[in-house]
């Protein structure tokens, strides 16, 4: 028993002395060196590695589902849904990303609930199936509706942590960090999608797990390509957008 105790004490003492001899330099990691990215002058401005999806001048990077050029109305550096013309989606495909966009719901209030300032940002929209992962856009300023359908919700899945909505007619921001889902070769989910969202600078979704496509009914996953378009929804309301940029992650 004494030998056992002595052996344990020796091991502890040797371990302490040995750890004291470790140089701090041995814990320093120099490679790989992070890529230099020049930030914008404010958090709203696109950094140097961003893909600008709307430059305030044209919708050249957007199309309708039928492949025709986007027909929404452009004015003074922003564009507005043309009700009935159909949703628009990016020509390019994306997976995991950091997405910044600004939106404004109509200053002239019409309707209530889901009929007021309604649109949506669909991440990884699959044209073939009509499915995607929707971040709800809505006028949620003094406009009660079901909580998992208000502004900043993962539609009918996750309620936003708080309601950070501004008044109608004021510009608002979404900063979305999206981690795309991964699928096994047999089409089963290897890793679900996750999303973090800041609404007007306020955290409203904190690494929320997306349970599947946000279409009507119980959400479920279906295997899809690793990159797909982003869609902005025509829900029949005059919602405006500006300053849209994205960083691939």
Kindly label every feature range from the protein language model.
Residues 20-249:
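Carbohydrate-interacting regions of secretory-pathway proteins
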